[in-house]
Every structure is written in structure tokens, then in C-alpha cells.
Swiss-Prot record:
GO terms for cellular component: membrane; outer membrane-bounded periplasmic space. This is Octopine-binding periplasmic protein. SUPFAM superfamilies: Periplasmic binding protein-like II. It is found in: Periplasm. The gene is occT. Gene3D superfamilies: Periplasmic binding protein-like II (3.40.190.10). It comes from Rhizobium meliloti (Ensifer meliloti). GO terms for molecular function: ligand-gated monoatomic ion channel activity. The keyword Disulfide bond applies.
Length: 294
């Protein structure tokens, strides 16, 4: 009888372990923000966040499915539980934090302008300079004023519903015509065709775009800006997924606010892969610079 009880207990433990190993989560990405995330010629998702997601899922010992979701619906669909987390170069902002939860950041954004090389805007002041809106606020504001005067009367393209579009609205709405697009690819097309004079985006995204043959005549000009307004990238979760949040501590993963356990999993895993240098390695592969947040 005792042996039978022991065997039953052992089977229960094994079954429990198997169930834990079979845990799966679905990660949403945009699939249109290279090199952070994009769909290749074969339709397969690729990029920095795809590689990072695979590393994190392996560390958490969970099975992950990565799916593409249009940017405009990416947060509402998370809240509606169509998937479990967001990894889509999403910056952490107070407005987004009202709706979803975020992991510890796994990447940092630097944003700037790009123009065609033969543009009259190619000699924008501040080229090669980098300003933190957090620690160099006065110097950054002075340079923003210089760029405002330089861009007066021009049209600037930006992806809508992003920290970049909000930055332009906050600092440039009185001098430039801000034209919003659904994707980076759309505003790049209009830049090449002359329908916009400049575009504003993450420097990592712009640099990747310039590697494409049809974008070889574009370049980044003017200063680069970073700081809380432009965000650090994190995993996004529903607000109830706090435990999952703990496993992803460096990119910012977005989660539902109720997912506390999932958040915890992501936080700890992100911290671990950052500490061991994996994020730096993946940064070098995809961006040629280290985007590890500090």
C-alpha cells in the first residue's frame, strides 16, 4: 500500500513537471520595424527582438509562439487576451502604463532625423551630437530651438502613435508640418519620392533602412535625442501578469496588468541575459551599437 502511494506521488510530481515544461506563451510583435522586428522575404519574422525572445523563452523554459500584429491594435489586442505579451520596440510611457504593465527595459532608443543626401536639409545643425533630455535638458532645448528654426516650413514624416510622433508634437508642431504614417516603410517611400522633406525615427531603424539599395542616398542628420520622453524598450504585459513581468528585465516587454507572475519571469530573465552580455551581443549583430539600457 505504501509503495502504491509512493508511486502515485511520484507520478503526480512527474505530471506536474511535464505540465510546467509544456507552459506556452504567445508574443506579439509588429513585424515592420527593422532591425528590431520585421518579416523577411519568406514571410518569417526576424530581427533583434525575435532573437531576444527566443533566448528569453529558452531561459524561462516555456514554449513561445511569435505572431505579427499591426501597431495600431497591438495594445488593445493584448488587453483582449489575443496574446500574452508584446515585444515590438515599444517605449515605456506613462500613458501606456495606465493600460498595461512593462518589464524592465531591454533596449534604449536614440532618435533623430533623416533626409536625402542631396537635400537642402543635409547640413542640419548638430550633426553628430547626442543629447539626453534627462541629464542635458537645457542644452537639448537650445539645440531643439536651432533645429526648429532650420526646419521651419518643412514637412517631416514619422510613424504615428509613437514616442517619436509625440516628441515632434511637443517640440516642433509650430515650425513643421508633421505627417504621420502607419509604418516606417511608408514614410521612407515618401522621403525618397520627395513627398516629405525629412523623417524622424529611432537611429537604429534609420541606419538599418539605409542598408537597403533604394535608401542608399539617405542619411541621418542633426542631433540624436534620448531620454524618458523617447523611452526605453520593454516587454509589455497585461497589468494582471506581474509574475511574467519579472522574467524579462531588459527590453520592455508589455504585459496585461493582471499578469504579475509572467512579469516577474520576464524581469529576471532579461536581467540575466543582460548581465551575461547576450543583449550586447545581439545589439552588435543587428544595430552595430549596444542598445543595452544603463
Amino acid at each position: 500500500m505504501r509503495l502504491k502511494s509512493i508511486m502515485c506521488a511520484a507520478l503526480f510530481v512527474v505530471a506536474g513537471q511535464a505540465a510546467a515544461q509544456e507552459k506556452s506563451i504567445t508574443i506579439a510583435t509588429e513585424g515592420a520595424y527593422a532591425p528590431w522586428n520585421f518579416s523577411g522575404p519568406n514571410g518569417k519574422l526576424d530581427g533583434f527582438e525575435i532573437d531576444l525572445a527566443k533566448v528569453l523563452c529558452e531561459r524561462m523554459k516555456v514554449k513561445c509562439q511569435i505572431v505579427a500584429q499591426n501597431w495600431d491594435g497591438i495594445i488593445p489586442s493584448l488587453v483582449a487576451k489575443k496574446y500574452d505579451v508584446i515585444m515590438a520596440a515599444m517605449s515605456v510611457t506613462p500613458k501606456r502604463q495606465e493600460v498595461i504593465s512593462f518589464s524592465t527595459p531591454y533596449g534604449a532608443h536614440m532618435n533623430g532625423f533623416a533626409v536625402m543626401k542631396d537635400s537642402k536639409l543635409a547640413d542640419m545643425p548638430g550633426s553628430g551630437e547626442v543629447y539626453s533630455l534627462n541629464t542635458q535638458a537645457d542644452a537639448a532645448k537650445k539645440r531643439i530651438d536651432d533645429v526648429n528654426a532650420f526646419l521651419d516650413g518643412t514637412t517631416v514624416g514619422v510613424q504615428g502613435s509613437t514616442t517619436g510622433s509625440q516628441f515632434l508634437e511637443n517640440y516642433f508642431k509650430n515650425s513643421v508640418d508633421i505627417k504621420e504614417y502607419k509604418t516606417v516603410e511608408e514614410f521612407n517611400i515618401d522621403l525618397m519620392s520627395g513627398r516629405v522633406d525629412a523623417v524622424f525615427a529611432s537611429a537604429t531603424v534609420l541606419t538599418a533602412a539605409f542598408e537597403q539599395p533604394d535608401m542608399k542616398d539617405a542619411k541621418v542628420v542633426g542631433p540624436l535625442f534620448s531620454g524618458d520622453e523617447l523611452g526605453k524598450v520593454a516587454v509589455g504585459l497585461r497589468k494582471d501578469d506581474a509574475a511574467l513581468k519579472a522574467e524579462f528585465r531588459l527590453g520592455a516587454v508589455g504585459l496585461r496588468k493582471e499578469d504579475a507572475a509572467l512579469k516577474a519571469d520576464f524581469d529576471s530573465s532579461i536581467k540575466a541575459v543582460a548581465d551575461e552580455g547576450t543583449i550586447k551581443t545581439l545589439s552588435s549583430k543587428w544595430f552595430k551599437v549596444d542598445v543595452t539600457p544603463h
